Amino acid sequence: MKQRLLALAMAAVMAMGLTACGGGGSSEGRTGDTMETYFFDFTVNSAYLTSDYAGRTPGEGNVLLVADITVKNTFEQSIEMYDTDFQVQWDDGDDAYAYPITTDMETYTEVEPVGENQLPGTYPMAVDEERSGELVYEVPSGFTDFSIAYLEQFVDDSGEESTGETFFVYFTAEDQTGASA
């Protein structure tokens, strides 16, 4: 997290005008909608549930959610993307969320992708670069309706953190587990 905040520090100087204007709202979309954040655009192209992803299997009572996304850097300089930018949620419970399996959330260390189309935990994006790939989450069985959320985060010159808009993309994942969810 600290590395992420440092990476955004330079961008935050330019973002001060935005945070001074309020921010803190939310936007929502559906599969195929392009969400336009301060730093990048992203689209959830499709999503499905599976019991196996490139040899990776979930723990008992869980399935894997595979979301195909496209990200485009629309900022005026290169940025570093993190898989933890994209949180998946399945209901309103306090613990009803997960981060991609490419980050160990107990140690905050990056884990190697297991699939060839899977986005890594961290990756650079040049100005106007666009990248598509899969985010893989371990989620409880029995759910097919999800949202992927992104929260804009800024750091000013003094190290003060603030947040901007939150973006939600709602979708129903196709069940490919072989069992009804």
Residue ranges and their predicted role:
Residues 131-164:
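Short, surface-exposed ligand- or partner-binding patches at beta-edge/loop junctions that are enriched
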Residues 72-129, 155-157, 171-175:
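The feature marks short-to-medium sequence segments in extracytoplasmic or secretory-pathway proteins
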Residues 166-181:
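Short, low-complexity, Pro/Ser/Thr/Gly-rich segments in the mature regions of secreted, periplasmic
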Residues 17-20:
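C-terminal motif of bacterial Sec signal peptides marking the signal peptidase cleavage site
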Residues 22-24:
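Bacterial signal peptide processing site
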